[in-house]
């Protein structure tokens, strides 16, 4: 038994060693916890700095724009059509002449009646008259079918494709489309809307892809037959125009073949120009030449012409094809520059707006994210100051806007 005297010593030694290791581990864990807390604190600080810096930059940009030269605001603002959620804010922009139009959609009816919306529009138009400026463009998306932004309370009509497919004869089709356009024109004019982003003249190519969640042209297109689409668009536009509502042919160069969704990301149209000219572009060209229609430019990249820029701000497409080859002298408006296919490009909405106006576009739409108006306007003001805006293109655009003004829809203001 005398030989086992060392056993307790070994046991105590092992116990002390384990306690030492445990203490060291706790120290390490404490340090790790401290480090993680410090890292989390730094990340939170960085996040807050980013938020406040971004918000501060936005507020500074907004103040700079609103304090800008009124003549410059009016000169550049006539090219911008913006959405809004805060009526007081858009009213301030109209008072300064800083925009050329407004976009009305579902949220503008939330919490108020059609009559209240009607009076808001009348108030904005009265402000324009006080400044001796032309009427605002007051636009909406009322295609019928799944894109009927103001239905209800306005009449919800089926898609034009359904009207066409149910027509027994060409004469019946003509009558039905006339009634359809008459309903849209009459109801929109009653609210004070003078520009409808319809009809869709993209051809139905039957393209259905999982990645296309928002464009879904196959559900909105009139037909796969370009002659039918051209005839229906012509009849529809004429019916609306009788009520003072201008139509919009969309979305050049045609979205029916796309597999991507330009609301979310870039998409390429790889079809040869010769094939597009013989098929997809027939409705655009025919109706553009024979009506008062505006034309909306989509955001796909037409790879045969310009591999770098979406059509909406591609000089090769806008100036090269539409203005030069087609000799089109009507109004061109872009699709929303809040969309991913523009916003996520290297140019962003600001650079894209400068390039669009320099290419020969008349109106740039900023509807979903109305806050983009301020950085876009600030960029335009700087571009003008540094001679980066084409004086020739802007002069031609002002001339077109003067020759094709919004139609004045008289809505009386409420008594004071």
For each of these PLM feature ranges, what is it?
Residues 113-125, 228-389:
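Second-shell residues forming the walls of enzyme active-site clefts
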Residues 84-96, 176-187, 278-284, 346-355:
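Short, acidic/polar
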Residues 155-170, 219-223:
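A charged helix-plus-loop insertion that forms the helical arch/lid used to bind
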């Amino acid at each position: 038994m005398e030989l086992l005297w060392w056993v307790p010593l070994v046991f105590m030694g092992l116990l002390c060693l384990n306690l030492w290791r445990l203490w060291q581990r706790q120290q390490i864990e404490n340090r790790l916890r401290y480090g993680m807390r410090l890292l989390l604190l730094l990340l939170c600080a960085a996040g807050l700095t980013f938020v406040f810096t971004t918000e501060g930059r936005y507020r500074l940009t907004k103040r700079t724009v609103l304090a800008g030269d009124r003549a410059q605001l009016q000169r550049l603002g006539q090219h911008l059509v913006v959405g809004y959620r805060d009526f007081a804010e858009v009213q301030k922009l109209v008072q300064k002449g800083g925009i050329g139009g407004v976009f009305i959609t579902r949220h503008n009816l939330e919490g108020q009646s059609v009559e209240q919306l009607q009076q808001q529009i009348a108030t904005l138009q009265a402000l324009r008259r006080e400044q001796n400026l032309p009427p605002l463009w007051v636009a909406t998306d009322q295609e019928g079918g799944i894109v009927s932004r103001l239905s209800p309370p306005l009449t919800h009509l089926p898609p034009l494709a359904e009207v066409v497919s149910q027509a027994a004869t060409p004469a019946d089709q003509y009558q039905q489309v006339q009634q359809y356009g008459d309903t849209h024109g009459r109801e929109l004019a009653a609210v004070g809307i003078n520009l409808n982003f319809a009809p869709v003249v993209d051809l139905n190519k039957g393209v259905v892809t999982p990645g296309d969640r928002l464009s879904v042209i196959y559900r909105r297109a009139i037909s796969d037959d370009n002659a039918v689409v051209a005839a229906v668009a012509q009849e529809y536009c004429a019916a609306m125009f009788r009520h003072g509502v201008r139509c919009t042919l969309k979305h050049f160069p045609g979205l029916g073949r796309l597999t991507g969704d330009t609301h979310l990301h870039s998409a390429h149209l790889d079809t040869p120009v010769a094939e597009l000219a013989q098929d997809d572009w027939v409705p655009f060209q025919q109706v553009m030449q024979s009506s008062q229609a505006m034309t909306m430019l989509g955001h796909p990249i037409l790879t045969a012409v310009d591999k770098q820029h979406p059509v909406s701000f591609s000089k090769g497409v806008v100036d090269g094809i539409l203005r030069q080859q087609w000799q089109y002298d009507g109004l061109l408006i872009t699709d929303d520059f809040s969309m991913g296919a523009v916003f996520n490009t290297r140019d962003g909405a600001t650079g894209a707006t400068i390039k669009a106006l320099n290419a020969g576009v008349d109106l740039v739409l900023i509807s979903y994210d109305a806050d983009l108006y301020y950085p876009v306007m600030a960029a335009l003001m700087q571009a003008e100051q540094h001679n980066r805006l084409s004086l020739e293109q802007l002069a031609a655009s002002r001339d077109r806007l003067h020759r094709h003004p919004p139609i004045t829809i008289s809505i009386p203001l409420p008594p004071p």
